[in-house]
C-alpha cells in the first residue's frame, strides 16, 4: 500500500474527528519519519509491512477517539513542539490568545512572570521564549506534569523558566508583573466531558468544584498578595464564565477588567490590573 492510498483509507475511518485528513497525515508522518509535505509530494511511495502494522495500531486507537497528540506524544503551541502525555491537558490554540494578551501588557523592562497550572509548560515556555529578559516561574500540583514541562524546556533550550510542584501559590514567594493561568474550569456535570478528545485527558486538569469556578476564585483571591503594583492577572475560562470571572476580579479590587475573545469568537480570557 502506498502513502496516498493509506491516507485516503485512514481519513475515511476518522469520522468522529474535526480534521480526519490532517489526523491521517500526522500519523503517517510520525511512523515514516517524513514531513507531511513529502507524503503528499511522493504519494506513490510504498509503506513497509512493519510500518503498516504500527499504523494500524495507531489508527485503531484514533478511531476510538484517543487524541492525536497522545498518539504521537507531541503538540505544537506558539510554534513550539511540546511533548505531551496523558498526565497533562493537551495545549489548545485558543490558549495562545492568553499569551498574546500577556505579551501586550508586560512592562518593557525585565520582570517576573508566574504561570499557575502549567501542565506541559505551554504558556510559560511561550512567554519565556518571547521575553528572554524575564524570569518565568511555573507551578503545577502534578509531579508528572512538572517533569514533562522541565523536559520541554530542556528540549527547547529555554533557560529563563523554573518549574515548581505545588498547589497554586504554595511554592512561590515574592511578587510578579504578571500572573497567568489556564486552570480547571469545567463543571463536573458538563456532558462535554464524555465527548471527543476530552474523555482521554486528566479530569483533574479540567474539572473544578462550584460549577467550575472554584479554582478561578481561589487564584483571584490570592493573587493580590503576589502582584506588583500595576501588575496583571490573566485567566482563561469557559465561554460562559466571563461575567462571573469579571465580578471576581472587580470584587477583589482589580481595575481595567476586560474579557478577550478566542479564535472562535468566544469569551476566553479575562484580565484585570492590580492597584498601581
UniProtKB/Swiss-Prot annotation:
Query: Which cysteines are cross-linked by disulfides?
Result: none
The record's Gene Ontology biological-process terms are: methylation; translational termination
Q: Where does substrate bind?
A: 182-185
Any single GO molecular-function term of the entry would be: protein-glutamine N-methyltransferase activity
Q: Which Enzyme Commission number(s) are listed?
A: 2.1.1.297
Cell cycle recorded as keyword: no
The residues the record assigns to binding S-adenosyl-L-methionine are 117-121, 140, 168, 182
Q: Any idea which UniProt keywords this protein has?
A: Methyltransferase, S-adenosyl-L-methionine, Transferase
The reaction(s) annotated as catalysed by this protein in its Swiss-Prot or TrEMBL entry are: L-glutaminyl-[peptide chain release factor] + S-adenosyl-L-methionine = N(5)-methyl-L-glutaminyl-[peptide chain release factor] + S-adenosyl-L-homocysteine + H(+)
What InterPro entries does the database record attribute to this sequence?
DNA_methylase_N6_adenine_CS, HemK-like, Methyltranfer_dom, N5-glutamine_MTase, PrmC_N, RF_methyltr_PrmC, SAM-dependent_MTases_sf
Instruction: Tell me which family the UniProt entry assigns to this protein.
Output: Belongs to the protein N5-glutamine methyltransferase family. PrmC subfamily.
Q: What is the protein's known function? A: Methylates the class 1 translation termination release factors RF1/PrfA and RF2/PrfB on the glutamine residue of the universally conserved GGQ motif.
Q: What is this protein called?
A: Release factor glutamine methyltransferase
Which organism is the protein's source?
Answer: Yersinia pestis
Amino acid at each position: 500500500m502506498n502513502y496516498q492510498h493509506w491516507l485516503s483509507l485512514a481519513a475515511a475511518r476518522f469520522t468522529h474527528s474535526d480534521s480526519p485528513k490532517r489526523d491521517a497525515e500526522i500519523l503517517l508522518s510520525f511512523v515514516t519519519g517524513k514531513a507531511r509535505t513529502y507524503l503528499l509530494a511522493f504519494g506513490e511511495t510504498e509503506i513497509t509491512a512493519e510500518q503498516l502494522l504500527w499504523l494500524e495500531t495507531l489508527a485503531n486507537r484514533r478511531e476510538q477517539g484517543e487524541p492525536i497528540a497522545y498518539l504521537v506524544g507531541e503538540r505544537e503551541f506558539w510554534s513550539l513542539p511540546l511533548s505531551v502525555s496523558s498526565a497533562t491537558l493537551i495545549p489548545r490554540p485558543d490558549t495562545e490568545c492568553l499569551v498574546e494578551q500577556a505579551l501586550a501588557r508586560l512592562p518593557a523592562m525585565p520582570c517576573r512572570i508566574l504561570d499557575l497550572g502549567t501542565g506541559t509548560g505551554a504558556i510559560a515556555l511561550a512567554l519565556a521564549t518571547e521575553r528572554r529578559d524575564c524570569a518565568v516561574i511555573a507551578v503545577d500540583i502534578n509531579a508528572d506534569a512538572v517533569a514533562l514541562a522541565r523536559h520541554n524546556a530542556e528540549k527547547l533550550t529555554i533557560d529563563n523558566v523554573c518549574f515548581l510542584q505545588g498547589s497554586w501559590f504554595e511554592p512561590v514567594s515574592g511578587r510578579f508583573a504578571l500572573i497567568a493561568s489556564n486552570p480547571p474550569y469545567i463543571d463536573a456535570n458538563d456532558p462535554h466531558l464524555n465527548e471527543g478528545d476530552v474523555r482521554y485527558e486528566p479530569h483533574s486538569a479540567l474539572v473544578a468544584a462550584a460549577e467550575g469556578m472554584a479554582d478561578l476564585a481561589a487564584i483571584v483571591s490570592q493573587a493580590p498578595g503576589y502582584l506588583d503594583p500595576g501588575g496583571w492577572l490573566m485567566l482563561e475560562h469557559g465561554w460562559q464564565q466571563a461575567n462571573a470571572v469579571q465580578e471576581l476580579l472587580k470584587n477583589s479590587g482589580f481595575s481595567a477588567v476586560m474579557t478577550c475573545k478566542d479564535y472562535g469568537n468566544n469569551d476566553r480570557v479575562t484580565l484585570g490590573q492590580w492597584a498601581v
